[in-house]
């Protein structure tokens, strides 16, 4: 029975060296060993396989591989190739040229995330980008549990503690269908605005938090009619259908505004200008691949954001 756990790389290389030079002396010279040392390596290898691997005919005195030896030599060559490839991959990972990076993006960012990932794949072709999308609360939880390496979001959280860098503008406003009574007004009266029905994401959404603060400040705590919906897409289609108004990231409705399906209302204090941030937890250093991706995202200067030049 072959004892695989007794086989070493040194033994395999000794076999390759002796078979290649046809002598113990030649093989020892190749490896910088003494002939007795290389003979010991081959003997141990033959004992591990349980069969002779080299044959030395008396008439020539040169070592030649047996059929079993040929099989082991071919395996040894494949092992060297695999180790060489592995060495390249390890170096690539350690230098940030390869690896996997999990990028978290808040739900609002799903409208530009594919473009960002495409740009990163061109800049870092050997780094695999895994995208993880969720609302603000989910993303903060992912950061705390180290489920993501980097995250693109609005206002950075207080906990967990993160390092952040601003990526680009993130405007918010109120949108309505083009035939809405408040559409086209130079300035929407506050009482008229607060009397409307608003469509909004559920609690935990960063946009919902910003909307609540804006309406509370505008109405001094006045209760506003609110209908919760599960996604920005549902909200957009509902506004287009005339079910109400919506306070949204203008990046979410860029196409609808461009094609006239929605209009932006001239409400007091709007648009609210926020920023997109790239964040990562400070309690765990970024791996080389994540550092590379971080640098590439910053270098893009928001070129992937809606409305940015193609």
Swiss-Prot record:
One Pfam match: HTH_1
Molecular functions per Gene Ontology: DNA-binding transcription factor activity; transcription cis-regulatory region binding
Gene3D superfamilies xrefs: Periplasmic binding protein-like II, Winged helix-like DNA-binding domain superfamily/Winged helix DNA-binding domain
Keyword list, A-Z: Activator, DNA-binding, Transcription, Transcription regulation
InterPro entries xref list: LysR_subst-bd, Tscrpt_reg_HTH_LysR, WH-like_DNA-bd_sf, WH_DNA-bd_sf
Residues annotated as domain HTH lysR-type: 7-64
Segments of the chain annotated as binding DNA: 24-43
SUPFAM superfamilies assigned to the protein according to its UniProt record, in alphabetical order: Periplasmic binding protein-like II, Winged helix' DNA-binding domain
Free-text function comment from the UniProt entry: Transcriptional activator for the cbb operon for RuBisCO and other Calvin cycle genes.
Similarity remark: Belongs to the LysR transcriptional regulatory family.
Name of this protein: HTH-type transcriptional regulator CbbR
């Amino acid at each position: 029975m072959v004892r695989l756990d007794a086989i070493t790389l040194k033994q395999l290389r000794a076999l390759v060296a002796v078979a290649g030079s046809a002598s113990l002396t030649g093989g020892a010279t190749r490896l910088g060993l003494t002939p007795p040392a290389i003979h010991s390596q081959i003997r141990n290898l033959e004992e591990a396989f349980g069969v002779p691997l080299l044959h030395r005919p008396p008439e020539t005195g040169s070592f030649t591989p047996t059929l079993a030896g040929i099989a082991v030599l071919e395996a040894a060559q494949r092992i060297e190739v695999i180790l060489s490839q592995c060495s390249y991959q390890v170096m690539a990972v350690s230098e940030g040229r390869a690896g996997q990076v999990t990028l978290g993006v808040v739900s609002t960012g799903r409208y530009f995330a594919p473009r960002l990932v495409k740009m990163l794949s061109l800049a870092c072709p050997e780094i695999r980008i895994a995208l993880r999308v969720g609302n603000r609360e989910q993303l903060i939880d992912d950061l705390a549990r180290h489920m993501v390496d980097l995250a693109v979001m609005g206002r950075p959280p207080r906990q967990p503690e993160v390092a952040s860098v601003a990526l680009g503008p993130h405007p918010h406003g109120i949108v309505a269908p083009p035939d809405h009574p408040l559409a086209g007004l130079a300035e929407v009266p506050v009482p008229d605005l607060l009397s409307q029905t608003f469509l909004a994401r559920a609690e935990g959404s960063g946009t919902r938090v910003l909307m609540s603060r804006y309406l509370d400040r505008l109405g001094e705590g006045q209760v506003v009619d609110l209908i919760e919906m599960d996604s920005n897409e549902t909200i957009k289609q509902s506004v287009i259908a005339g079910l109400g108004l919506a306070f949204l990231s203008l990046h979410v409705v860029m196409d609808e505004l461009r094609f006239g399906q929605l209009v932006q209302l001239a409400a007091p204090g709007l648009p609210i200008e926020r920023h997109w941030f790239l964040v990562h937890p400070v309690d765990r250093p970024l791996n080389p691949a994540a550092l590379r991706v971080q640098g590439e995202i910053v270098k893009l200067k928001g070129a992937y954001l809606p409305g940015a030049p193609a």
